[in-house]
């Protein structure tokens, strides 16, 4: 049965200054573009609404394969780039308690970004609890409810829990951020995302509490009265025969070694010692399929001194798992440049943008350390013009 949100009548989020975004959608801010002479990668020093409109007008519609953005969270804080004893202002999040102004800002940007993404592309929007749910409704409208893939929960990292100093609390400590993942097309498929996670082989009970009568059959003289066996009868009988062959002819070597010698695709079932239930063998694993709870890595890093620097492991996972070599990756709130550095390392093309001089300077330095030289001062062709943004 189709979701109600997939019908012609859409659910929309309305706010106090609804439609204000239309008044700012065409604003032309000063822009500066830094371009690599060989790869064509672009770094914009400008307001990102100007940059995405420039890309639309210069042939990038439907060309970007993966977008990761980390917009302000609506905390109302000032952020810095801290090096030794020097603090350089990076940006100020002015949206605390100003939900309508935040929505006026983010809506037109997401609307244009949606046009830039390729048919098989995706967007990942990194937020926290302050404005996550408002942005989710907006993205359902712009990208389509049916194109929502996951909310990814990511561990913040080394953030101290300050609640220990109080005798009572009014809320729990927040230890996670969230990333909203949308695809451009509902039919797009991805390979299983795998992460390293070494697990030894083990025997486990073959019975499951899922109640399917058609999966109840006799094994070792026993038929379950409720629940079911995990596999079909034919598959289970073959696994029993496999184990009999191993015990009869190869018991002098460990079962795991025998499994490796037989192309690592044999399955085994045996009668559990001392009880009537069968058990099946789970082979060792070096990788497991990733789910949406990412507690094995951290969202933030502290290598550059930039307050909101994202961890390279986070971007390696997103870019490595959900894009291909030579794909075009973009980050329109690029901050310290982690997305661009990782994209460069993984063999992707990239586009970055930030309005902060501090962020652009830091990004340039990081890219230079990634064997990437930038040609500065190029101005865009067409009607956009202007000098450097301070």
Where are these regions (language model features)?
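Conserved SAM-binding loop of SAM-dependent methyltransferases across substrates and taxa
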Residues: 338-348
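PRPP-dependent phosphoribosyltransferase catalytic core
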Residues: 357-390
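Conserved SAM-binding motif I beta-strand of class I
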Residues: 350-354
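Class I SAM-dependent methyltransferase "Motif I" SAM/SAH-binding loop
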Residues: 333-337
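Class I S-adenosyl-L-methionine
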Residues: 7-328, 360, 367-370
